[in-house]
């Protein structure tokens, strides 16, 4: 590794970081077993939701499926991502703490929601309305604040991941 190779991150000022010092190495994943490897440990499946092969399948159900996270903080921004495949009908959205929801999703692909919480309820929900499809790779990470002294506002992170 050549420590003389740097990438510049713009965050109100300039910060030069070694290229091996990537932002992603500082992200704390809050979902336990979001890839459903080997089962649904840490998940509570709602009616019409079943474990597939390292994923969960919804069958035209309108229900909540949930995961208790280590902690969600009031007034924080969170990035929620998940993958939909085998979409057939209905819609699904993420919900943090039972009060704030992301967008309704009704197609295959990787989904991204930024959700600002107003509850300290540590439960992440996937709420479906007649949804038929498969969900995998559920992730929740905190956005904003300072990570290892870096300015990680939503705008700066959006620049980093685009």
Question: Where are these predicted regions, by residue range?
Answer:
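Polar, enzyme-active/binding microenvironments
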Residues: 1-162
């Amino acid at each position: 590794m050549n420590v003389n190779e740097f990438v510049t991150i713009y965050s109100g000022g300039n910060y030069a970081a070694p290229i091996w010092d990537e932002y992603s190495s500082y992200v704390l994943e809050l979902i336990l077993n979001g890839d459903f490897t080997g089962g649904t440990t840490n998940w509570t499946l709602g009616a019409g939701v079943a474990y597939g092969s390292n994923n969960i399948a919804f069958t035209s159900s309108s229900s909540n499926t949930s995961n208790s996270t280590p902690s969600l903080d009031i007034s924080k921004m969170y990035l929620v991502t998940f993958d939909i495949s085998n979409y057939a009908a209905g819609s699904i959205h993420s919900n943090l703490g039972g009060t704030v929801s992301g967008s309704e999703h009704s197609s295959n692909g990787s989904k991204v929601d930024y959700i600002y919480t107003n509850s300290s309820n540590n439960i992440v929900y996937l709420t479906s309305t007649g949804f038929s499809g498969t969900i995998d790779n559920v992730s929740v990470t905190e956005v904003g604040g300072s990570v290892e002294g870096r300015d990680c506002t939503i705008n700066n992170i959006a620049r980093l991941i685009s």
